[in-house]
Each structure stands twice: as structure tokens, then as C-alpha cells.
A protein has these predicted regions:
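Transmembrane alpha-helix boundary and packing residues in multipass membrane permease domains
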Residues: 8-9, 45, 86-87, 124, ...
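Short runs within selected transmembrane alpha-helices of multi-pass transporters and secretion channels
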Residues: 40, 109-128, 135-143, 168-183, ...
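Helix-terminus/linker motif at the lipid-water interface of multi-pass membrane proteins
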Residues: 2-20, 89-96, 152-163, 223-256, ...
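Transmembrane helical elements of multi-pass membrane transporters/channels
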Residues: 1-7, 108, 142, 175-179, ...
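Short alpha-helical transmembrane segments in multi-pass integral membrane proteins
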Residues: 47-114, 160-216, 272-337, 379-421
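Residue-level hotspots within pore-lining transmembrane alpha-helices
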Residues: 2-3, 32-36, 76, 80, ...
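Small-residue-rich hydrophobic transmembrane alpha-helices
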Residues: 8, 19-79, 116-135, 233, ...
Length: 421
């Protein structure tokens, strides 16, 4: 996620059209990466609960099965993204002047998607064992590496050729490869030194079943959201290049707002999973409430700062007056949206950690498609409110789901959904 944002920011100094094209590509790639989340979400929940119950053998089995499955999935997805780039971007309605940027970027980044598949799996395993500091350190190192690579390859510095968008793609793919290697070294040295063969004879189909039982509905909610965003990006593309470019800038800006909510939710989910494994249900409930309050407060403060700085930020990124005007307005609308997003990020992670994986999926599918997509089309295209109208629909979607999830957490119906007996 961060690598794509860095690419967008640095390409803003290269071409607004390049930013728009890469924004569409990253939406497709993020959707593809959610396929890996089927396994990763199950890995995180199971490892957290097994560690809470002191069942180390089961932890090793879960991690081993997860790595194998995501390697296979990663190779398949890599092939689809690389060879299917022109077709997929044509289906997204990408204009000819943007296609040259989009295809080149997608073919390179997509070809190495399996790097991300394995990195996400190892990161989920480490975080569930209270070793989140290692993935965080790797992210910092890799982003610095990507910034240096982008600067060198986009603009032709340090004796490198000026490759533009393809340079950004090469830098991103290389950074993800380095990330994967470092994470595996940490996994073997700090967490699981080896995977004993006898742990996998016979193959632990029970753990595979549990991974899919948790992962399919959990990733299904994420995939529903991402697919709805792909369709909404198609709608925004119909509004023109300026709207599409503005959307790309805003999405990457506000990501820095909700990163804290993601970090709090992931850390809280690990602790909640451990508490559920230890049968400390009341403590898990109170921790979830605390995480939600902190996430909302920080997201609200950061989104207000972003809104107040909006004109300055957009003026730095582009000299297109319409993009600056439109983006500044949307950042103010986004302030209320981020409150609902913070609740959703906390609630979906917390409910999954307890084993209550179906409820977020059902709510997500119904509300995302009826409100975000339905109202997005109605407000943005049918009524002619444009990109601001679509952002109002996103605001309604996030906050309606947030209210529903808070009621679910307070009901305590998740308390009997754990997988460790």
C-alpha cells in the first residue's frame, strides 16, 4: 500500500496522466492482493488464538500451510496481472493516452505479485506472535529503498536511465523482493527456526479447513469493498482525467490518515485473539472499545489537519487549478468519512479475531453495494454532483457500517465464536 502511494507522489512530478494511470492500476493490484488475504487473515486469527492457548505445534502447522498456499496463489496472480494487463485496463475504460503508462507499470509490478503474497503471510505470522516491530522495520527500510529507486529510475539520476513510469514499477518490484527476503530471514531467526516434516505428516487438513473457514468470509468482505471501489473508479473515469487524477491524489493522501487506525486495529486484534484463546472475554471486549476510541480520535485529528492543508498539498503536487480546487473540497468531506472508516477498520479486525467472521462479510456486501456503489452512481453521475457527490456516498457507506459494527460488538454475540476449544 505504501509503495503505491510513494510511486504516486513521486510520479506527480513527472506527469498527471501517469498519476491517473498508476492510480487505476493500483486499484486493480490491490484487489488482486486481497486474494492473498484469504490465507493471511486466517493465519493471523488462528495463530493469535493458538498462541493464547499455548499450542505451538498448531502455530507451526498454520504458518507452513499458509506459506505454501500463498506461494501457489501468488504465482497464478502474477501471471494473470502480467499477461492480462492490456485486457484488464481496457475493461476499466482507461483512455488511450493513459494506456501506455498503465500497461507498462502493471506488467512489471504484476509479474512479481508473488513477492507480496509471501511477505504478507510472513508479516501476519510475526504480528500474531507479538513481533509486529519486525514487519514495521522492514516497511521503513523498503520504503526508503523504493524512494531512492524511484528517484533514480524515474528521473534518471545516479547514472541510471530515465524510465519514467516503468522505472517506478521496477523500483517497486525490487523493493517488494527485498522485503520478502528480509521477512523470511526474520521468521527463521526470531520465530520459527524450522518446519519439522513430521508436523505435516499427515497433511494438517484441519488447519487448512480452519484457514479457509476464517479467511474466505474475512477476505470476502475486503474483496467486496475493493471490487466496489474498482467499479466506482470506472464511474470516476467517466467523469474525465481531472476527476480520476484528483481521486488518485486524495486516496493516497488520506491513506496516511487511516494508517494509524490500521496499526491500532491490527495490534488490538492480536491481543483480542490472545485473550479469546485464554477465555478472557470481558477483557477482550474492553480492549476493543479502547482501540475504537483511540482510532477515532487520531483519525479525526489527522483528517482535520489534512483538510486545512489541502490547498497547499495539492498545489505542491500539481499546477492544474481544477484538481487543486476539487481535491481541497473533497478533503473537507473526507473528515467525516474517516470517523466511519476508523470504526470499520477496528470492528472488522476485532470481530475476525474473535472468530466472528461471517457478520462483517454480510454487512459489508449489502451496505457497500447498496450505498457506496448505488448512491455513488446516483449522486456522482445521475444527479451530476461529480466526484464530490461520490465522496458523499462513500461517507454514508463508511458511517452506516460503522454504526452497525459498534452495535454488534456491544451485543457480545461474538463471544462464542472462538476456534480454540
Amino acid at each position: 500500500m505504501m509503495l503505491g502511494a510513494v510511486d504516486t507522489i513521486m510520479l506527480s512530478q513527472y506527469s498527471d496522466n501517469a498519476v491517473a494511470a498508476v492510480g487505476v492500476v493500483n486499484q486493480l493490484i490491490m484487489f488482486a492482493f486481497l486474494i492473498f488475504e484469504v490465507i493471511n487473515l486466517g493465519t493471523s486469527v488462528l495463530c493469535s488464538q493458538y498462541l493464547g492457548a499455548k499450542k505451538q505445534k498448531n502455530v507451526v502447522q498454520v504458518v507452513g500451510v499458509a506459506i505454501l498456499l500463498n506461494l501457489v496463489l501468488g504465482l497464478v496472480v502474477s501471471a494473470i496481472l502480467h499477461y492480462g494487463a492490456p485486457l484488464l485496463l481496457t475493461l476499466m475504460g482507461l483512455r488511450p493516452e493513459l494506456m501506455v503508462y498503465g500497461v507498462g507499470y502493471m506488467e512489471i509490478v504484476g509479474a512479481f505479485a508473488f513477492f507480496q503474497a509471501l511477505s504478507l503471510t510472513v508479516s501476519a505470522s510475526l504480528r500474531s506472535a507479538n513481533k509486529a516491530v519486525y514487519p514495521m522495520m522492514v516497511i521503513v527500510v523498503v520504503n526508503i529503498l523504493n524512494i531512492i529507486g524511484n528517484y533514480s529510475l524515474i528521473f534518471g539520476k545516479f547514472g541510471m536511465p530515465a524510465l519514467g513510469v516503468e522505472g517506478a514499477a521496477i523500483s517497486t518490484a525490487f523493493a517488494r523482493g527485498v522485503s520478502m527476503i528480509i521477512l523470511f530471514i526474520i521468521l527463521f531467526r526470531k520465530y520459527i527456526p524450522k518446519f519439522p516434516i513430521d508436523y505435516f505428516r499427515p497433511f494438517p487438513f484441519v488447519e487448512l479447513k480452519n484457514l479457509l473457514k476464517i479467511g474466505l468470509p474475512s477476505a470476502g468482505e475486503n474483496m467486496s469493498y475493493s471490487l466496489s471501489q474498482v467499479l466506482l473508479t470506472y464511474f470516476i473515469n467517466m467523469l474525465g482525467n481531472e476527476a480520476l487524477t484528483t481521486r488518485t491524489y486524495v486516496v493516497n493522501m488520506v491513506m496516511f490518515v487511516y494508517l494509524f487506525a490500521i496499526a491500532m486495529a491490527q495490534g488490538g486484534a492480536i491481543c483480542i485473539g490472545h485473550l479469546v484463546g485464554e477465555k478472557k472475554i470481558r477483557a477482550a471486549y474492553l480492549l476493543g472499545k479502547y482501540v475504537m476510541r483511540i482510532s477515532i480520535l487520531v483519525s479525526l485529528v489527522l483528517s482535520c489537519i489534512w483538510a486545512l492543508m489541502g490547498h497547499t498539498l495539492f498545489s505542491w503536487l500539481t499546477d492544474n487549478a481544477e484538481i487543486v480546487r476539487l481535491g481541497t473540497v473533497i478533503l473537507f468531506v473526507d473528515v467525516i468519512l474517516e470517523v466511519g472508516r476508523a470504526i470499520n477498520i477496528y470492528a472488522t479486525n476485532a470481530l475476525r479475531a474473535t472468530g466472528d467472521v461471517n457478520y462483517p462479510f454480510y454487512v459489508g456486501v449489502v451496505v457497500q453495494w447498496s450505498i457506496a456503489v448505488g448512491c455513488g452512481y446516483l449522486f456522482g453521475l445521475y444527479w451530476g454532483w461529480g466526484l464530490v457527490g461520490m465522496w458523499c456516498a462513500f461517507l454514508l457507506d463508511e458511517n452506516i457500517r460503522g454504526i452497525i459494527f459498534v452495535r454488534r460488538w456491544n451485543s457480545m454475540k461474538w463471544a462464542k465464536k472462538g476456534f480454540v476449544k
